[in-house]
A protein has these predicted regions:
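Solvent-exposed, amphipathic alpha-helical segments
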Residues: 21, 25-28, 71-82, 158-165
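Short linear capping/connector segments at secondary-structure termini
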Residues: 111-118
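Hydrophobic/aromatic residues within well-ordered alpha-helical segments
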Residues: 64, 68, 72, 104, ...
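Helix-turn-helix
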Residues: 17, 21, 25-59, 63
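Hydrophobic/aromatic-rich alpha-helical bundle segments in the mid-to-C-terminal region
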Residues: 109, 121-189
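Hydrophobic alpha-helical connector segments
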Residues: 63, 74-107
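N-terminal intrinsically disordered/low-complexity leader segments
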Residues: 1-13
Length: 191
């Protein structure tokens, strides 16, 4: 039994490492130009070993985005279940969103920004739109109009802007920028 568990752990580890390597390569080189062979080489496995876990780049991209979206969807479900949200509840949810963004890091943000067209053309693209829209709807007060939904979207985008600024402009401490993004997001939501 222990030998079987060791094999399963290696498979899981290889899969998780493949997702991490692919995320970095997709973010830095682009989804379109990154090949399965390149992912396998960076991972230190054969293309056949990678193929055991993922048959296509689309499967890899979908797995990466689904992992990210699961956390966002959980926030949206939590926010919806707690309606109507108090200011303190909204603040807590935005703080959790900030933690989720920090967990995924700059590579996820760059992946989405730099490969937006490709992502939107895949089935996961619709899921990205739906999950983000559900979070915006849950964080916007009941009966709010377009202006309040835009306020929520703007608040959530502060974390992406901070991460990109830190990565591209080498503008100070990334943690300080994320803290500033949180403060700005909360100010925006407070109106």
């Amino acid at each position: 039994m222990a030998a079987r568990e060791g094999v399963d752990n290696r498979r899981t580890d290889t899969r998780e490492r493949a997702l991490a390597v692919a995320l970095e390569l997709f973010a830095t080189h682009g989804y379109t130009v990154t090949s399965l062979r390149e992912i396998a080489e960076h991972l230190g496995v054969t293309k056949a070993a990678l193929y055991f876990h993922f048959r296509t780049k689309e499967e890899i991209l979908t797995a990466i985005l689904r992992g990210y979206l699961d956390g966002i969807a959980a926030l949206a479900v939590d926010a919806t279940a707690r309606q109507p949200l108090t200011a303190a509840m909204r603040e807590e949810l935005v703080r959790r969103f900030a933690e989720h963004q920090a967990h995924w890091g700059i590579d996820l943000i760059l992946l989405v920004r730099q490969n937006y067209t490709e992502i939107q053309s895949l089935p996961i693209g619709e899921e990205v739109r739906e999950v983000m829209a559900s979070l915006v709807a849950a964080l916007a007060p009941a009966g709010s109009g377009p202006a309040e939904r835009l306020r929520v979207r703007t608040a959530l985008s502060a974390f992406q802007i901070a991460a990109v600024t830190a990565a591209r402009d080498n503008d100070g401490d990334g943690d300080a920028l994320q803290e500033a993004a949180l403060a700005i997001a909360l100010e925006i939501l407070a109106g």
